[in-house]
Amino acid sequence: MKLALLGYGKMGQGIAALATAKGHTITAQINSKNTLQQQLEQALQADVWLEFSTPDTALNHIRTAIKHQKPIVVGTTGWYAHLNELRQEVVKFNATVFYARNFSLGVHLFFKLNQSLAKAMQNHPPVVRLDPPWRHG
């Protein structure tokens, strides 16, 4: 698969190493010195864009992906105030945007643990805790 990496910090570099080890090709590596506008031609050769930059930059990257109908996976947080307007653009351009509010392994493990715990506890009676009111004086 051909990938464009939009944001080449720790996460972008880690993805690049993993992707190339699995036989994928990186068509563009976007960072503060090599912008998407400068490498747009290379980025458009990718099958999918992976976005791990900054909130302001991510918004521009997402809009560019939508405009060019490039599927984009967004790991950057902090741009959600624009989510509703981006949804309208996705519909207008028939684009694909996948985002997650947190790509942290620890957070995903926590959610999985909670799901497992909820499943294990579903056949047990509910737990109720009653605290007596505090009396001062």
Language-model segments: residues:
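Conserved anion/nucleotide-ligand pocket segment
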Residues: 109-137
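NAD(P)-binding Rossmann-fold cofactor-contacting core
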Residues: 14, 18-39
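Rossmann-fold NAD(P)-binding glycine/threonine-rich loop
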Residues: 63, 76-100, 105-117
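Glycine-rich adenosine-cofactor-binding loop
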Residues: 2-15
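Hydrophobic beta-strand scaffold residues
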Residues: 26, 72-73, 96-97
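Rossmann-fold NAD(P) dinucleotide-binding segment
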Residues: 40-44, 48, 52-76, 83-86
